[in-house]
Amino acid sequence: MKRIVVDSSASLYALDGIDFASVPLKIVTDEREYLDDGTLDAVEMATALRTYKGKTSTSCPNIGDWLEAYEGADEIYAITITGTLSGSCNAAQLAAEEYQAEHPEARVFVLDSLSAGPELVLLAEHLRALIKEGRDFDDVCEEMLRYRHHTHLLFSLESLANLARNGRIKPTVAAVARMLNIRVIGKASDVGELDVLCKTRGEHGALERIVLELKGHGYTNGKVIIAHCGNPAAAERLMHMVRAVFEGAQVRVTECGGLCSYYAELGGLMVGFEDADA
């Protein structure tokens, strides 16, 4: 049996037409633990955390969680959040080694997305297409490594508090953004770090900048997935802007799951897209 497994940083909890599993991350506070399993009300969580004064953090899946997701399959393709900022990829890889030791006939490929959110959805959907084409294991792995070079992630955030609190960006950047009431535009870098590209005032300016960044990163008219945390109006507006600028653009809007909502926070947008060479 062939199976695709992703961690919940993808905000993807089901994938039609293929055997599929999502491995949840957790959002942890002093008072409760949120399991990002697809049933979590992510906007409600983000709203509660906005005024929460205690410590918060995230917890990645452990080896056992990944092993459970692999169980019963003999050809497994796992996609994880960037290994630069999370231990999920390492746990998935260690689980793959253990699973293959116990099941010598099985083959497991772990792909570090070097990203999060909607870029993982692009990767998972491309992977599904390859499997359904009947490609062999080695061919699928090679093509996924190639395709990963041509998918990208941009983000627009109203708040950087949780990113700074968990060491994902510098606290000084978050403090300046808060004081000046600005939105931050950033991207996932080629090594899986979160880089700030620019700061803008107002949502319209942020959306315009995203369109410019799409063009600057080689987007022409491929797939775009816009994920939002409690901000459907901005996501829909951006979708129409992209379609107006790029003829034939394949754009759709989704919602951030728990992990992405924790880091994007209320109002945040995450934009996964393919460049022209995808």
Regions found by a protein language model. Name each.
Residues 105-106:
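A short helix->loop->beta-strand "cap" motif at the edges of active sites that frequently abuts
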Residues 2-3, 9-27, 31-32, 85-88, ...:
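Mixed-charge interfacial surface used for oligomerization/domain docking
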Residues 32-101:
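Class I S-adenosyl-L-methionine
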Residues 80, 109-110:
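A glycine-rich beta-strand to alpha-helix segment
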